[in-house]
Amino acid sequence: MSNLDQARVASRSAETTRVALIKAATSVFAEYGYDGGSVRLITQRAMANQAAVNYHFGGKDGLYREVLIAATKALEQNSFLCPEELDARSPEEALRLYLRQFLLPLVKRDRVSMYLRIFAWESVRPSEAFNAFIVASPPRIFHLAERVVKRFLPEEAPAETVTFATLWLAHQPMFFVRDAERLARAPFALKFDESSLERLVDTLASFSLRGLGNP
């Protein structure tokens, strides 16, 4: 094998390791959050050594940033909601669509759902890595929440009020997504399927309409 061929094999091997680390990190961070997701567990799932994390990403923060970048891209590509669609609906319909989209991880276990779980973890355990990321690239869940709440608030509403309402709405689905496994156990014993998802959307929409001043 020539030196060039050896370099190509090494390059492919390095890229395979890099992709495996990002995939493993996504599942670990979705399950345990940034703080609870250890590099040791990530490398075990990726079948790589811990030095590979430093080599490819410069450390845990760099790896997490790559996961967040992938999450943002995936949510943009897979979202069935867009700002224009929200604007075309009535305020109540826009609210329901928003809630349903971000509650879907309760009944789906695809990669997009894992990304939403990561964002849900950040709602209670914000990491410095995430804070630095959202300054440059605010997650879609906040953009869409702001779009929805502005449909209910007066045009002259202070920016602070809009921000309060946006954060409040964004956190409605996050709680259920983040704590789904705990809520499925006693004493709550909630069952999450398509039918219960619709009932949850109905309930949260009803509460949210009252909270947004539109009973």
Language model feature labels by segment:
Residues 138-163, 186, 212-215:
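Hydrophobic alpha-helical bundle segments that form small-molecule/ligand-binding pockets
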Residues 80-115, 162-169:
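Hydrophobic alpha-helical connector segments
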Residues 15-23, 56-84, 131, 135:
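An amphipathic alpha-helix adjacent to DNA-recognition modules
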Residues 110-132, 180-186:
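Amphipathic alpha-helical segments used for helix-helix packing
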Residues 1-16:
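N-terminal intrinsically disordered/low-complexity leader segments
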Residues 20, 28-62, 66, 70:
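Helix-turn-helix
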Residues 115-121, 158-180, 199-210:
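Hydrophobic alpha-helical segments that form the core
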Residues 76, 93, 127-153, 202, ...:
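Amphipathic alpha-helical packing segments from all-alpha helical-bundle domains
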